[in-house]
Design a protein with these regions (language model features):
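Catalytic adenosine-cofactor/nucleotide-binding cores of aminoacyl-tRNA synthetases and other
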Residues: 4-59, 157-162, 208-209
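Structured ligand/cofactor/substrate-binding pocket environments in proteins
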Residues: 4-6, 18-43, 93-96, 125-150
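Core structural elements
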Residues: 30-43, 63-75, 93-113
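Acidic, turn-prone loop/beta-hairpin segments
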Residues: 49-77, 109-199, 203-227, 247-250, ...
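Short helix-adjacent coil turns
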Residues: 83-90
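Short, intrinsically disordered, charge-biased short linear motifs at domain edges
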Residues: 259-266, 273-283
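Short cysteine-rich clusters marking metal-coordination/redox-active sites
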Residues: 274, 290-293
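Cys/His-rich microdomains that often coordinate metals
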Residues: 281-284, 294-297
Length: 298
């Protein structure tokens, strides 16, 4: 109740009449759960992460990890500006959208497989990004969710110099990280992913597949789109789409989406389902594991 009320105050635009009601409080309770669950996912996946010894340098991170850090940096800039102008509603909505759109619906969904199945370096890259994002996120949310922020902070592994209480920490500073080419590249990747998601939803409706990991996606590309997507390792592209397999084909075909020069088709992936990662692979063994998961389990 207290948390819901504090979110109601923070989310309200005090320059106009403030509304209150059961539906509004219900929506805020759901928003709080989304923000809390975002933090819980990050905490749950850095349990074995020691920031003093396991942190990976930013230039060695996967591109999607750097994208997530840039997204968090943009959040920092927006929230700091909102707090400086006492615009708590703007800060709240920026934090909420970051949790739902950037983290839950995209980044955290994509890296789950890497956190559970990848080699040590790939996993540490994802953990590094999660750790850095969680530290900044907790500081940013503290002014409007002080008790939740302190609860999160108490579980975060501390580097030397970090305070016991989050309210004693300085707010994170937004860095100057303008990279138009990087931003344009990832905007294009996300647009392709959004188109593929729509085709996957139709394939589910047609009973071609159940979950997206049952899918093998063929992307029909013009020359420019082929070169763009072919520069991304196919296993990373499959992870971005959350499917078992991706093929690139030059030429027209499949269902057209909003992305220029791209057509898509979906079929059921070949092979059997790995009992650990749930991806379909023709090399799944008698133990029900794909070679990658068998290697992880030793």
């Amino acid at each position: 109740m207290c948390i819901r009320d504090s979110l109601w105050v923070a989310s309200s635009d005090y320059t106009v009449d403030v509304r209150a009601g059961k539906n509004i409080f219900k929506q805020l309770s759901e928003a709080y759960r989304k923000m809390r669950n975002t933090a819980r996912f990050m905490l749950g996946n850095i349990g074995d992460f020691n920031p003093a010894t396991d942190m990976v340098a930013e230039d060695q991170l996967f591109e999607i990890d750097r994208w997530a850090l840039k997204s968090c940096n943009s959040l920092t800039a927006n929230v700091r500006a909102a707090y400086d102008n006492y615009d708590f509603s703007r800060a709240y909505h920026a934090i909420y959208n970051f949790c739902v759109i950037d983290m839950s619906n995209f980044y955290m969904d994509v890296i789950k497989d890497r956190l559970y199945c990848a080699d040590e370096h790939a996993r540490r890259c994802a953990q590094t990004a999660l750790y850095r994002i969680l530290v900044d996120f907790t500081k940013l949310v503290a002014p409007i969710l002080c008790f939740t922020a302190q609860e999160i902070w108490s579980y975060i592994p501390k580097l030397e110099g970090m305070q016991e209480y989050v309210c004693w920490e300085r707010m994170p500073e937004a860095k100057s990280d303008e990279d138009a080419a990087f931003d344009a590249k990832w905007a294009k990747i996300i647009a392709v992913r959004d188109d593929v998601k729509k085709v996957l939803e139709q394939a589910r409706a047609d009973k071609t597949i159940g979950s997206s990991l049952e899918a093998a996606v063929t992307l029909y590309c013009n020359d420019e789109m082929y070169d763009f997507l072919n520069a991304i390792p196919m296993d990373e592209l499959a992870d971005l789409m959350i499917v078992s397999h991706v093929d690139l084909v030059k030429g027209e075909g499949g269902v057209r989406g909003l992305t220029e020069g791209l057509g898509m088709s979906v079929a059921h992936a070949a092979g059997n389902k790995c009992l650990r990662c749930w991806k379909f692979d023709t090399a799944v063994g008698e133990d029900g594991l794909c070679p990658r998961c068998a290697k992880v389990l030793g």
